[in-house]
C-alpha cells in the first residue's frame, strides 16, 4: 500500500503553498525513500551568502515535515560570512523595521518537492531544497529563492522566461595536517592551512588536467548522479584552480544547480581528503582569482524562441536584448556584492 501525505489541515494546505503537481511529487518522495532505503533527508535552504543551512530529518518524520515544514530561527538569514548575527534582534524591529524577525523568532522551511535528490556520497541520505515562510504562511521576502521567484514572475507576466548557463571556478587544496585546539574555535575560526595540488599557470593543458583526473572523476560522478546538467570540466589558469560548466536551464533551475553543485563539490572533496573553496581569491601566495559566469538570454515563454536575437544582421542584439544588457551594466556595481 502506497504511503500518502497527511495533508489535512497541514501548513502547506492551509496556506495553499503547493499545487497538485507538488503534492504528487511529494507523494513520490515517500515511495522513493522506501525503494532507495533512505534513512534521513536533509531539509536545507540557501542563505544570503549561498550557504546551505537546515536540519536532517529521520525517515519517520519526513512526511509530516514535508506538509508542515520545519522551524528554524530567523537569525539564520541575518548572519555575515563569519556566521555572526549582525542585526540587533533583541531590539524593536530587529534593525529591519519588522517585529517578525525580532527576538530570533521562528521561520518555517517548506520543501520544494521538485528539488529532491539522493546524495550519492552519503549513505541513505536524501536532500531537498526549501523556501522560507513566516508562521502565518507569508513568504519571507529576504529568502533568496523568494527574491528570484519574484523577479521571474514579473518576467513571466511579460511572456518571457530566463534561460541561463553556468560556469563556476574554484580552487582545490590539500589541507596541511594540524591538531585542532580550543584556540582555533573562534568566531570566525582560524583559517585552514592548505597547500596547492599543482604549480599552475598551464591553462587547459591535458597533462595537468590528468594529474587531477582522479579527483575530477569522483566529482563528475557525484554531479551526474544528482542529475545536474554537467557539460565540461576544465583546468583553469592558476595553481589548483578548476572550472566546471553546465548546460542551459530555465528559470530558477540554474540557481538551484549552483547551490547543489557547490555543496556537492565541497563535500565530495572533503571525503577524499581535499578542501574545495569558491572564494574569489584565497589568501595563499600566487593563487589566481576565481569567478563565475552566467550566460543569459530571454526566451518566449510559450515557444522558447530567443528574444534577444535581432531581426536583422545590423545589430548584435534585439531592442529587448539591448535594454536587458543596459540594465545589467547599470546595476553591475551592486551585483558585485553577490
Where are the regions that the model predicts?
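Short, conserved phosphate-binding/catalytic loop or strand-edge motifs used
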Residues: 168, 236-244
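ATP/Mg2+-dependent ligation/transfer catalytic cores
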Residues: 1-232, 254
Amino acid at each position: 500500500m502506497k504511503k500518502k501525505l497527511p495533508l489535512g489541515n497541514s501548513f502547506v494546505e492551509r496556506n495553499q503553498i503547493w499545487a497538485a503537481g507538488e503534492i504528487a511529487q511529494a507523494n513520490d518522495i515517500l515511495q522513493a525513500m522506501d525503494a532507495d532505503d533512505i534513512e534521513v533527508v536533509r531539509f536545507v535552504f540557501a542563505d544570503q551568502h549561498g550557504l546551505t543551512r537546515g536540519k536532517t530529518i529521520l525517515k519517520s518524520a519526513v512526511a509530516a515535515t514535508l506538509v508542515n515544514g520545519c522551524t528554524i530561527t530567523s537569525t539564520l538569514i541575518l548572519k555575515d560570512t563569519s556566521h555572526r548575527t549582525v542585526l540587533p534582534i533583541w531590539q524593536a524591529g530587529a534593525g529591519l523595521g519588522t517585529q517578525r524577525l525580532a527576538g530570533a523568532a521562528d521561520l518555517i522551511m517548506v520543501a520544494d518537492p521538485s528539488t529532491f535528490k539522493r546524495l550519492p556520497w552519503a549513505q541513505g541520505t536524501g536532500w531537498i531544497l526549501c523556501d522560507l515562510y513566516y508562521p502565518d504562511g507569508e513568504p519571507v521576502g529576504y529568502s533568496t529563492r523568494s527574491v528570484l521567484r519574484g523577479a521571474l514572475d514579473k518576467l513571466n507576466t511579460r511572456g518571457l522566461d530566463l534561460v541561463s548557463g553556468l560556469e563556476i571556478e574554484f580552487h582545490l587544496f590539500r589541507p596541511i595536517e594540524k591538531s585542532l585546539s580550543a584556540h582555533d574555535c573562534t568566531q570566525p575560526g582560524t583559517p585552514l592551512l592548505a597547500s596547492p595540488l599543482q604549480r599552475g599557470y598551464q591553462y587547459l593543458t591535458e597533462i595537468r588536467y590528468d594529474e587531477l583526473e582522479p579527483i575530477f572523476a569522483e566529482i563528475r560522478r557525484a554531479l551526474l548522479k544528482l542529475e545536474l546538467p554537467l557539460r565540461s570540466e576544465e583546468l583553469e589558469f592558476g595553481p589548483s584552480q578548476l572550472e566546471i560548466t553546465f548546460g542551459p536551464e530555465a528559470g530558477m533551475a540554474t540557481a538551484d544547480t549552483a547551490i547543489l553543485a557547490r555543496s556537492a563539490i565541497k563535500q565530495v572533496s572533503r571525503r577524499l581528503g581535499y578542501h574545495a573553496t569558491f572564494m574569489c581569491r584565497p589568501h595563499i601566495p600566487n593563487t589566481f582569482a576565481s569567478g563565475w559566469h552566467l550566460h543569459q538570454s530571454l526566451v518566449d515563454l510559450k515557444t522558447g524562441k530567443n528574444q534577444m536575437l535581432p531581426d536583422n544582421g545590423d545589430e548584435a542584439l534585439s531592442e529587448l536584448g539591448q535594454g536587458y544588457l543596459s540594465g545589467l551594466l547599470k546595476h553591475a556595481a551592486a551585483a558585485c556584492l553577490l
